[in-house]
Structures are given as C-alpha cells and as structure tokens.
Amino acid sequence: MSVIKMTDLDLAGKRVFIRADLNVPVKDGKVTSDARIRATIPTLKLALEKGAKVMVTSHLGRPTEGEFKPEDSLQPVVDYLKNAGFNVRLEQDYLNGVDVKDGEIVVLENVRVNKGEKKNDPELGKKYAALCDVFVMDAFGTAHRAQASTYGVAEFAPIACAGPLLAAELDALGKALKEPARPMVAIVGGSKVSTKLEVLNSLSKIADQIIVGGGIANTFIAAAGHNVGKSLYEADLIPVAKELAANTDIPVPVDVRVGLEFSETAAATEKAVNEVKDDESIFDIGDKSAEQLAEIIKNAKTVLWNGPVGVFEFPHFRKGTEIISHAIANSDAFSIAGGGDTLAAINLFGIADKISYISTGGGAFLEFVEGKVLPAVEILEKRAKN
C-alpha cells in the first residue's frame, strides 16, 4: 500500500495536525482504559522530536453535532497527557486558526461536535486543512469512515500522510492477508454467521483453515447434522455454512461444553457433539476439540484471530478460548488479533506480549479483512500519487 509515511517527512517548524483515536472510556472525568492513549503517545513524541508544532484531535463518544456538552470533552485525555509529562492544553475554538508554541501539544476539542464532521462537509475539511502544513492520519479505528477529520482534511491539506500506528496496522494486515506465510489459519468467533458472513467469505479465499467459534460454530455444527438444542444459531444460514464448509477446511468441534441456562453459575457438562439434548445450549468447545485446534494453530505460519470460541466471560465456559489463546501465544506464526472480545480475552489470559500485532480497529479491522477499501486509506493513497 503506497502512502506517504510521517516517519519519512521533515517536520521541523511545520504545523502538524494529527487525527488520532483517543475515544477512550471516561467515568467521573477520569480515563478508565488508557490503551488508545498509550498507543498514540509514540506518535506525539515523534512529532515533537522532529520539531513539529503539534495539534492532535479525536472523536469521543457520540455527541450531537453543533452542541457542546462537558461530558463530550477531551479534557480527561488532556489531564492524562499532563500526568504523563507532556506540555499540553485544550483548544475548544480552533476552526479559525490556533497558535501552537514549540514543544507544546494542542489538543483540539472533540471533532464530532463540529457541524458537518460525520457527513464529511468539504467546508469543514478545508478549515481543518488550513490549520496545518501536514495532516497525519493515525486513527485506524475510524479509517473505514469518510468524515471531515479522516477524509476531507486529507483531500485539502498540503501534505497528507499515515502516522506510525496506521502504517504499522496496514503493514501487519497486509502481511497477514496479501501474501501470508502458509499454512494460514483464521479464527472467527462471534454470535452470528450473518454479522461475519463477508469476513468468512473473504477468508475462505485466503486461509488454509478457518476455525469457527461461538454462535457461528453452532450454525456449522447444525449444518453438519447435529442437534444444537437451545443453542444460539441461525437455521436460515445452514445452507451458507454447508457451502462454506464444502469449499474450505472448517473443522467442526467433536465435543462441546453445554449448560441449561446462560448464566455465570450454570453448571457445565462436557459431551460429544452428537449428544447435545434439546434443553441444552452449547457455550464452549470441549477439551478434545480445543486440543485438535491447538495442534492446527501450532503448525500454522500465519494466524488471524477475530473472536473467542466460547462464552469466556463465564469461568465454566472459558477453557476452549484459553487453550486456543495459549496456542496462539506459544506459536511461531505471525499472529494478528482484532476486535473487542478478542482483546478482552488477550488481556484476561495475559498474552498481549506474545501476539505479533494487536489491531486497534474494530469495524475497520473487519472491513479490511472483508477486502473493502477503507476511505481514509484510499485518500492517502490518492494524495501519495499526486
């Protein structure tokens, strides 16, 4: 993917506008999960080291355009950066210009409060562009949205480039999907086939094997002719599951863990996949299945992981996801993981340092895997050509 990279540019004395993803959870004015801020800090440090006049902005939550409310403010992010040792201030009224001193970071208030942000109003894009000499797109998590701060500004800024985070994300996804080392194994979990159908279709053309988990696996179990009892599955997508299974190596679990109700205290019973009763629900794969899948992962050279294989939030139905998580962690394969539940599992099992690349994007990650063009990346490619 040919985009200009921030790392290659001379930024000395230049006004640099960084679109980051600082959309973090906030409670009582305090940041409760700082992962996205921590991921952005190296970009901010690099811009300062290069002698740039640094502005950074992001969306936060879902504010109403044109109506600023205190709970929509990036102030908690500013407080976090101050505590991390940065010379930083918040600018609320910036669309007509902002003065940035050497060595300081100016955080521009929540972009989604600006009228025209979401619909990519070109006039707003031009106002953002007028603030800078260089626009840096570093928010992979919003790269699938063509908005004024992700697309419009990139059209009109003198130079538009990819920040280190975005560049790393594109490199990692390209490595996993464009020319993967083989065998390539994809793990796709989640509650519904319908929400991951395009992902499954796209991966069926790339992966040597697809491991399915969660409610998705239940639909494949039903497609293989087994009773799934009261399990979450999609009867109308059984023909689709059969077609995918006929054209791709998708191993169906040989054993499962079932319960009588969806609750943390429900007793778990392990049994063969063909022994599920009408009043039971499948909430996890069994030990034999987990070990078989771990063996597949062990032999892989590329692993793409999106979604757990069971209800890992409940201790009784955690083991399948735990075994697979450790198989990925202990594998020599290039591994890339993405999606909220996947990140929660990675944190739960303490394996973050053993995954080659952890994607910061949810929807953008899935759309890239589906083979879709990400608008914010497309405009950077166009600008690189010109």
UniProtKB/Swiss-Prot annotation:
Q: Which HAMAP family match?
A: Phosphoglyc_kinase (MF_00145)
A single Gene Ontology CC term: cytosol
Locations listed in the record: Cytoplasm
List ligand-binding residues for substrate. Answer: D21, L22, N23, R36, H59, L60, G61, R62, R112, R145
Q: Where are the transmembrane segments?
A: none
**Assembly description:** Monomer.
User: Is Nucleotide-binding included in the keywords of this UniProt record?
Assistant: yes
Q: What is this protein called?
A: Phosphoglycerate kinase
Q: Which organism is it from?
A: Haemophilus influenzae (strain PittEE)
**Enzyme Commission number(s):** 2.7.2.3
Binding sites annotated in the UniProt record for ATP: K196, E313, G339, G340, D341, T342
